[in-house]
Amino acid sequence: MSSLGDPAVLPDGGAWSAWLDDAERIGLVTPAGRDLALPHSLAMAEALVRALPSLSSRQDPGGDRSSSEGTLPAGPRKRVVDLGSGAGLPGLVIAAVLPETEVILVEASIRRAEFLASWSGELGLGERVKVWNGRAETLGRDPAHRGRAMAVSARGFGQPAVVAECAAPLLSIGGVLVVSDPPAAVDAGDLDPLPWDEARWPSDSLSGLGLEALARQSTPFSLSVIAKVRTTPDRYPRRVGVPAKRPLFGTAPPDSR
């Protein structure tokens, strides 16, 4: 699966270049970030693939199996939810390199949602990619989506507490959250996997959402992988906007009023 790190694995490279051109033109990708956009997304896809085999034997030690959240869904396509998809990073890339998946791109902005819908078709992914134009908190309350995802990806979606609270209800037991972190401050000689960043992703707080730390890597990009091991309490996610205003852990952003 190491070949996933090479953008050459993407079909029809010209179409992907045109997609990035359009994303840069309307300000969804910066010129400085463009060159890293595809490699970063491919690294997240690879982290997802590496994590899932190790989860196949996980059991829910105390979760309520009668709840709306079950084990990983059976069937030829596994659901991946990309939070705050923006230009489609990494959601569109995951859909392209993992053809057994269906990918839901969550985007609150109408303009960005229209961009995603248009380009998912242009890239030949329209059948397997759906765009949710709304808030992640709302999606997590929808019985058609709660507890149905094999994986959730998040790149630049929000603070860790917001990501965890919005992702946990969407995941099936045994699923994983793959999230992009700020670059890790490590020496070049240090090896992956890195020790878990307890300050950024406190284990006790994750446990309250039914989550558990799984892996952390610094190369080629800083990523954390978090497993769903038990049912998320029904009270999560809280109302739209509350996870950011009153985070379950960490520090709330300054009030901009």
Predicted features along the sequence, with ranges:
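Conserved beta-strand segments that form the floor/walls of ligand-binding pockets within enzyme
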Residues: 82, 93, 104
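Glycine-rich, flexible loop segments associated with nucleotide phosphate handling
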Residues: 72-80, 148-150
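Glycine-centered tight-turn and secondary-structure capping sites
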Residues: 86-94
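Gly/Ala-rich phosphate-binding loop of Rossmann-like dinucleotide-binding domains
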Residues: 95-99
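Conserved class I S-adenosyl-L-methionine
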Residues: 58, 76-86
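A generic alpha-helix surface/boundary motif
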Residues: 17-18, 88, 200
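Class I SAM-dependent transferase core
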Residues: 1-75, 111-112, 118-124
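S-adenosylmethionine
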Residues: 91, 101-102, 108-257
